[in-house]
Design a protein with these regions (language model features):
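FIC/Doc superfamily catalytic core
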Residues: 1-200
Length: 200
């Protein structure tokens, strides 16, 4: 299990505390308008999100990972290429839905952090969509299996993830309910279901 600032040695306890603390921080991102003045689609903004969510739990919050990581048979960007990959992602266009999702897929392949990539990157994606096209994703309408399968295939074929996410777009960009339900759903994709964001 990961070393943590909480001194926890049980992975079940760590998972519970990680969910409780970072979900509360995710709600505060919205409540305190922390993202409003950050540049959309930049790695520096993703770093800010990740650090804000996980700083009370992990020393590596907001910092580039120092190990190679994989999920199943898929290896994320090797360490030696990660910095150049992130520079390229920063420069990718983001003027329409397709470009934004292509950028999101590349950031997922980069997987820049040791832990917490999916949860922080989905917030980063919504920030980009909100800023650039005045929409966000209603994640409560995105089926877990459809999403995970589409993301697994996205490095080779991104048409599926575009389809899945386009069908869940909403213009309720300032709705607290859409945001907090979305956080709960985002955490559910990763197996975190002990707490509700609007009750923390």
């Amino acid at each position: 299990m990961l070393e943590n600032k909480l001194g926890l040695t049980s992975s079940a306890e760590l998972a519970r505390e990680e969910e409780r603390i970072s979900k509360k921080k995710a709600a505060m991102l919205f409540e305190n308008h922390i993202l409003d003045n950050l540049e959309s689609g930049k790695f520096s903004t993703l770093q800010t999100i990740h650090k804000y969510l996980f700083d009370e739990i992990y020393d590596f919050a907001g910092k580039l990972r120092t190990v190679n990581i994989a999920k199943g048979n898929f290896r994320f960007a090797p360490l030696m290429y990660i910095e150049s990959a992130l520079k390229n992602i920063d420069e990718m266009p983001q003027s329409n839905f397709d470009e934004i999702i292509e950028k999101y897929v590349e950031m997922n392949i980069a997987h820049p952090f040791r832990e917490g990539n999916g949860r922080s990157t989905r917030i980063w994606l919504d920030h980009m969509l909100k800023t650039e096209i005045g929409k966000v994703i209603d994640w409560s309408k995105v089926d877990k299996e459809d999403y995970l399968l589409a993301m697994e295939r996205s490095p080779i074929r991104d048409i599926e993830i575009k389809y899945v996410l386009k069908n869940a777009l909403t213009d309720e960009i300032d709705s607290r309910e859409v945001y907090t339900k979305g956080i709960d759903h985002s955490y559910y994709y990763e197996g975190y279901t002990a707490f509700k964001a609007d009750e923390l």
